[in-house]
Amino acid sequence: MDMKTKDSRTSRYREVYARWQRDPFGFWAEAAADIDWFEKPKKVFDPAAGIYGRWFVGGVCNTCFNAVDRHVNAGRGEQPAIIYDSPLAGLKHTLTYHRLLTETQVLGGMLRDLGVGKGDRVIVYMPMVPEAVIAMLACARIGAIHSVVFGGFAARELATRIDDCKPKAILSASCGLEPGRVVQYKPLLDEAIALAAHKPQSCLILQRVQTQTSLIEGRDRDWAQMRDHALIHASSAFDCVPVEATDPLYILYTSGTTGRPKGVVRDNGGHMVALKWSMKNLYGVEPGEVYWAASDVGWVVGHSYIVYAPLFHGCTTILYEGKPVGTPDAGAFWRVISEHDCATMFTAPTAFRAIKKDDPQGKLLAQYDLKKFRTLFLAGERADPDTLIWAEKLLQVPVIDHWWQTETGWAIAGNPMGLGMLPVKPGSPTVAMPGYDIRIVDEGCRELPAGKMGSIVVKLPLPPSCMPTLWQADARTRESYLDEFPGYYKTADAGFKDDDGYIFVMGRTDDIINVAGHRLSTGGMEEVLASHPDVAECAVLGVKDQLKGEVPCGFIVLKSGVNRPHGEIEKECVALIRDKIGPVAAFKIAITVARLPKTRSGKILRGTMKKIADGETWQMPATIDDPAILDEIGSALKRKGADAAVK
């Protein structure tokens, strides 16, 4: 199947995008009719509200109602809502919409009994289990604001989030599961609360069979015991709490360019409208079909496309607690797709690079029947053409790259399967979705011609679902996203458009690197390395990695007088990052160098160092202080075996 020969004339995309351009507010008013409102919005968009305007002002709704109740009310309660498939736990079970409603009502009642109400924050620090999804929905049901933190994140990172959003309660579990090991969550949670200035009133702990943990009297409650008690009391069955469309649904923290995380806020109304629209028009999925986002609920993909969008659309969503390889082999994804009749899958290119590495010929696919499988979507990092083409040839279905951010909550650019597929250009996530007016500009905010690389920006206002602000940080939002290019949202990505309007995203313009689809701050890692008593200065940059796309590589300069073995200090630095940021950083390369290359003004030449590490051609920077240092960097990389040529 050659995706490049598709005829764009068969797609309705141009017509739909033009309709949005002609009447953007009418377009989104029509999309909003697919949502159940308690009170319809008074204004589709109010340009005077918020920092760039707000969507569906005056509308009253509830996210949980649209994800669960409406389907039960429509007589579809016996349809599967969630398929839980955990090769790590050796468990599989299905929750119908009716069962999901019951569980969400019960947990909502439990949260109310813990004193949680409308507008209160709740941190969800959990593994990939159904209770994590139920926790998110239960918060939405009672009007509380959830903040999901990736299970197993380091205690210090969790503590900063506790202090920023000040949760009334934390929902967690005794442990998470990784291949060959159990990750204890409770000690991390206890340490985080000890580190944090803010103390939650209560913690609700799910005891998993793999580990039973001790509970702190007066603060911790046993999930199962409290659930059993709540089930006996009929008061747990209650209606959804009405909230404003502009009220926050959740806060999701993403890496900032400093050590302080950014709490991206998602509102209720716009989030539902955009995600519901995307399921049919972008992903081409119908209600009742099985949809699988192979991600984690701790990341934005998990929020939008494991939990909310499939449930808004009345689909069956797969919650997979496993890996693309090693649980048990590189055929794991094919088993899940085959066994559960999955129609559409969404994952990061990293997963397919791992499968390709373990099973380059795709021989394990022959064991499975993927008869219902129609489309594979990739996002979270740049999809390299080799991986995309390999997956397309193996699966014989369209493989669609698309591009978006934690801040937007859904695709900025994609190939809209529901409107008719456009020709694929490997390396491009295709075209702007309705709602996004994408421009490529230079440093002076002047628009650049086709083929010219520049900063990718989006003309304001951003569409529904995009963040209205960062949590209690309007000034920081303006500074981070709006001030540099007045009238535009700064994506902090660089790229270009071609003559057909296709967008090519080439990389980040700030210090955020993308490790296996996870956005991580090199600045944050540098802060940690600099805290080592023997380190004088350091630089962390993302270097190319065949499996993860990018991995961080740290260069450290030791303080004078330090005469300990370099290898010993480097191991301590690796352990320090693991402890302070977590294994998700994938930080394994620390290299001791005598000095770092800098400009005469003292700025570290990270871009040139990255090119050397990646084996790319580079030019001597005109502003360099001492050209000989770059040769020293190259030699240090070769000694460590960390340069691209050695890899």
Task: Name what the model sees in each region.
Residues 137, 141-226, 349:
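Structural core segment of the AMP-binding/adenylate-forming
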Residues 64-65, 82-137, 154-159, 218-228, ...:
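Conserved AMP-binding/adenylate-forming core of the ANL superfamily
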Residues 149-174, 189, 338, 345, ...:
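AMP-binding/adenylate-forming catalytic core of the ANL superfamily
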Residues 315, 343-347, 356-423, 437, ...:
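Gly/Ser/Thr-rich phosphate-binding loop
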Residues 78-80, 203-206, 210, 216-253, ...:
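Conserved pre-ATP/AMP-binding loop-to-beta segment of ANL
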Residues 201, 205-207, 579-604, 616-646:
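AMP-binding/adenylate-forming catalytic domain of the ANL superfamily
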Residues 431-435, 446-481, 520, 617-618:
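Conserved ATP/PPi-binding loop(s) of AMP-dependent carboxylate-activating enzymes
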Residues 272-290, 300-343, 357-363:
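Conserved AMP-binding/adenylation subdomain of ANL enzymes
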